[in-house]
């Protein structure tokens, strides 16, 4: 009697799964194989997809090899021009316009390796999208589809005539025919959709699949009239104190003020914990900084408790921290749910190196909060436009800049650059500085500040781009509301669109981390 067959020797494994960061290089290689005449994804594009909408990025893996993939984002399609381009709908491929509350999934690419195009890989990827649309209760899936065989007929018929013949099955088009077979219906034909697509003569068919399981919400989720975020900026006075408890009392007072105003964020200045030097009685600046690092746990414990107690997210200024024998200038985000994040200062001023021996960090971070994505760029860092652009591309809508400057010239560098970053990146920026003086403390003798909240410059925002600002050089707070929904709409339809209109064909910023 023959032995029972070992069926595992015959098995082949096909998996449709979400894309992970380890797959990115393989996805780029796959695109080169699928579309040899078109510019492939850049790594930063695919990383941005995973940061903004990881659930919408799928790949087909066969025997350990990635042989197909698809990418998508969520939008409210009513907010876009019918004659949009691929660049418009994807924010130049970065999908930073992804709207988690959107009613429509927009598919921006599907590709299958040429060797595997008889295995219904495209159909499987489309089904994964449809399953996700049902799970998220989306109204429809919309795609801008290529018509890659049109160039063969372009001299004898218009794009509309070609599409009509494909729809009537008189001409076969590998993309449009496939989409029709998968339940998509034609909405319109868009010219100049994808400049690199010479096979389609730059045309695309706008197609839609309607989710028959969609349940309309009682509220009109597709139109969000406002997304207000209230920010309380503390312009903190540096004056002599006699204990950490006295410092804690002052801090709690301001957090209480922010909470009473129902603020979403309370923002403290850079290295305002150097106020502790006033009772440490250490004359050497470098030794005084080392003494301050001994209060790191007390500082973190204090702000964590206050964020939870007063139900407000706190940008805890910044604090000197010793790690592995080096001292860093670190800004902390204390979320009101009790979690903590940190951002190292990346650019160290000559003064910080000379007096305190501060070391530089090496990562630009963007943090999720209950009020959207934010970034923190400490003082000098806001003077380097590359960092703000990287943060904006990672999805940040607000950049907080705690600062500490001793004179008006230093302050104006921070202010002017902060306002410039707001315009360049169509984001809100916030600066919070120290005032007063510490006469017996080396290198912290005098302070100058006028803190503020800044917006882009367009009709939807404050006339002069200033949401609110303090009076110069006195201890006080300023409280202002910023609207992330207005910001989102302005990025799509503003008088100018700095993010969309970048010339990526002649320059780009590469983040090396």
Swiss-Prot record:
Span of domain N-acetyltransferase: 14-212
CN hydrolase domain residues: 229-484
GO terms, molecular function: acyltransferase activity, transferring groups other than amino-acyl groups; hydrolase activity
PROSITE patterns recorded: CN_HYDROLASE, GNAT, UPF0012
Coiled-coil stretches: none
Cystines in this chain: none
Family per similarity comment: Belongs to the carbon-nitrogen hydrolase superfamily. NIT1/NIT2 family.
Protein's recorded name: Probable hydrolase YhcX
UniProt organism field: Bacillus subtilis (strain 168)
Taxonomic classification: Bacteria, Bacillati, Bacillota, Bacilli, Bacillales
Gene that produces this protein: yhcX
